[in-house]
């Protein structure tokens, strides 16, 4: 039995090595590089995941793996492949629907839903009215509207956290029965709404110096930490990872609660960057290995590692909930079929 397992393991290793297109070190060890484009909110868990996978690959597969790791807004991550023609092995996004919308069938034929999150409002003790925000979180929209308070969110055209943030503010209109979107978004930017449908022009213009927009949500972390920005809309996992103070929002607007999906989808947004319309829905992350991945077999090994108990543990340690089980769509590779629930 053990001999059979060893032979099977060796066969897998040789198969991977034969498909790598990598090189060798001076000592003859196989080397390979994985190119990963991922959402900024995945930076911390992916850094740890890559470190642990490198150890695993060297020990179990005999491969010294290096990473070309590029964090950006998820829309930008996808467009690096679809619009700029850049090569990548793996694309991981904060909104799984970007993969079937923009990448299937030309660039990939499967994807996996693997993690969740929620939108919160983060700040520090330096932020104006921080104590009041903590004591009266239901007044968040009143505090953000004050003339001496600055707040930010990421660019809806580049980053799901951005379009989710503005949809959260439109959902807040419905939940609180007050013109929160008009006050916080329409009066301060050129993003506008017709009823519950939002339009984000290709070039976002900020009309109020109190509002800051950056390409991805993690670009705003340093501004808040330094005290140059009071508040920003961010994923809970990122707020936790950076030890920021934050308030949670009602389940009706935080995009966390799957039982509220029918309420969420009342709001939608059309992005000027892609022309696509996106409906508000519970936050679910997605990942895929591309058809023409330079190191496809090794990329699938990385995906297996992410979906393993070790991968789930890394996400839990970084305050991000893992889907149980992860859900896969499309032409799901044999290598991961035992780790996911396959849906049509």
Swiss-Prot record:
Binding of tungstate, residues: 40-41, 74, 159-161, 217, 235
Leader peptide range in chain numbering: 1-25
GO cellular component: plasma membrane
Membrane topology (UniProt): Peripheral membrane protein
Chief location bin: membrane
Keyword Transport: yes
Any Gene Ontology biological process: molybdate ion transport
InterPro entries documented for this protein: ABC_trnspt_W-bd_WtpA (IPR022498), ModA/WtpA (IPR050682)
Binding-site positions, molybdate: 40-41, 74, 159-161, 217, 235
Key words, A-Z: Cell membrane, Membrane, Metal-binding, Molybdenum, Signal, Transport
GO molecular function, one term: molybdate ion binding
Cellular location(s): Cell membrane
NCBIfam families linked: PRK04168.1, tungstate_WtpA
Family per similarity comment: Belongs to the bacterial solute-binding protein 1 family. WtpA subfamily.
Protein name: Molybdate/tungstate-binding protein WtpA
């Amino acid at each position: 039995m053990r001999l059979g397992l060893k032979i099977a393991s060796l066969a897998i290793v040789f198969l991977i090595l034969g498909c790598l297109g990598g090189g060798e070190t001076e000592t003859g060890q196989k080397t390979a590089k994985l190119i990963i484009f991922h959402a900024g909110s995945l930076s911390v868990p992916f850094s740890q995941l890559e470190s642990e996978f490198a150890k695993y690959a060297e020990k179990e597969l005999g491969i010294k793996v290096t990473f070309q790791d590029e964090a950006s807004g998820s829309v930008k991550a996808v467009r690096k492949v679809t619009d700029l023609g850049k090569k990548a092995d793996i694309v991981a996004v904060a909104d799984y629907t970007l993969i079937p919308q923009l990448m299937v069938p030309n660039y990939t034929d499967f994807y996996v839903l693997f993690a969740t999150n929620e939108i919160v409002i983060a700040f520090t003790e330096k932020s104006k009215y921080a104590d009041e925000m903590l004591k009266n979180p239901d007044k968040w929209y009143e505090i953000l509207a004050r003339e001496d308070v600055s707040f930010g969110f990421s660019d809806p055209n580049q980053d799901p956290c951005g379009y989710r943030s503005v949809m959260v503010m439109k959902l807040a209109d419905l939940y609180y029965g007050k013109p929160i979107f008009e006050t916080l978004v329409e009066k301060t930017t050129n993003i506008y709404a017709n009823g519950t449908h939002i339009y984000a022009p290709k070039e976002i213009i900020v009309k109020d110096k109190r509002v800051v927009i950056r390409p991805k949500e993690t670009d705003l972390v340093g501004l808040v930490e330094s005290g140059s920005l009071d508040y920003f809309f961010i994923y809970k996992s990122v707020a936790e990872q950076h030890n920021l103070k934050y308030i949670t929002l009602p389940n009706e607007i935080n995009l966390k609660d799957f039982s509220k999906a029918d309420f969420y989808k009342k709001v939608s947004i059309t992005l000027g960057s892609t022309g696509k319309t996106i409906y508000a829905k519970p936050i679910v992350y997605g990942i895929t290995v591309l058809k023409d991945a330079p190191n496809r077999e090794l990329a699938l090994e990385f995906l297996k590692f992410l979906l393993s108990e070790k991968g789930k543990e890394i996400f839990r340690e970084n305050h991000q909930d893992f889907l149980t089980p992860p859900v896969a769509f499309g032409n799901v590779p044999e290598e991961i079929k035992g780790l996911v629930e396959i849906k049509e």
